[in-house]
């Protein structure tokens, strides 16, 4: 109990004072300076425990605790910065919708599939289904949330189609298996809970899944399918 209280007192000290000298100075009274006539000597006496009415804390312990506190602060800051949408103020509904889903897709609680139909840099109409969680892990989304770059489907995504060249591809991802050419059209099987995600707009998206059509000014069409992942027991 005493050890815990001492630790709490030390933590309070390193929070309150920026340097060890500041802490020592706080323990020195005007009377000490009057009799000793030497600030450095007064500091040494406080450090040795001969002066001061508060907690005696050695320099190395103060500096070690200070370093640990700074490391903890930087770690928390880094964790906060892992969200690519952090600090961004997207104006378009599509980017706002992605920002709302980013954290859940990063921590595995949700695996969203994004459908995009738009024109590429060559003016060709393309469409495709993107595993949002996978793309978040494999590229920097800050350029999308800041508006510097436009998110578009690629031939390496879950599904891709170029309406002009008629190039069509489909690929599994770490989260989904592609089940193509069924009577129900294109289906995706979640690899974690093995639930089927149906992207047919006329059908139900499936268990633990929702379909959200986004009103957007930057794409011809955008739809987000959210699947709440539940590991199969």
UniProtKB/Swiss-Prot annotation:
Keywords: Cytoplasm, Nucleus. One of its GO terms (cellular component) is nucleus. It comes from the Eukaryota. It holds the Pfam family DUF4464. Its main location: cytoplasm. The keyword Cytoplasm applies. It is found in: Cytoplasm; Nucleus. InterPro entries: DUF4464. May be involved in spermatogenesis. This is Cilia- and flagella-associated protein 299.
């Amino acid at each position: 109990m005493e050890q815990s209280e001492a630790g709490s007192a030390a933590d309070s000290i390193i929070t309150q004072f920026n340097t060890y000298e500041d802490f020592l100075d706080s323990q020195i009274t005007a009377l000490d300076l009057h009799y000793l006539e030497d600030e450095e000597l007064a500091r040494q006496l406080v450090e040795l425990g001969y002066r001061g009415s508060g907690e005696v804390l050695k320099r190395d312990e103060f500096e070690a605790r200070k370093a640990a506190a700074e490391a903890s602060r930087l770690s928390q800051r880094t964790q906060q910065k892992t969200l690519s949408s952090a600090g961004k103020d997207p104006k378009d509904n599509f980017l706002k919708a992605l920002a709302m889903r980013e954290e859940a897709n990063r921590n595995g609680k949700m695996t969203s599939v994004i459908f995009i139909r738009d024109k590429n840099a060559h003016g060709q109409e393309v469409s495709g289904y993107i595993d949002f969680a996978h793309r978040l892990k494999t590229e920097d989304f800050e350029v999308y949330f800041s508006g510097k770059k436009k998110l578009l489907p690629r031939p390496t995504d879950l599904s891709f189609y170029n309406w002009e060249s008629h190039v069509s591809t489909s690929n599994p991802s770490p989260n989904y298996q592609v089940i193509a050419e069924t009577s129900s059209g294109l289906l995706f099987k979640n690899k974690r809970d093995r639930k089927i995600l149906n992207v047919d707009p006329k059908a139900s998206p499936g268990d633990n899944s929702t379909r959200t059509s986004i009103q957007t000014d930057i794409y011809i069409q955008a739809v987000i399918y959210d699947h709440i992942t539940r590991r199969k027991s």
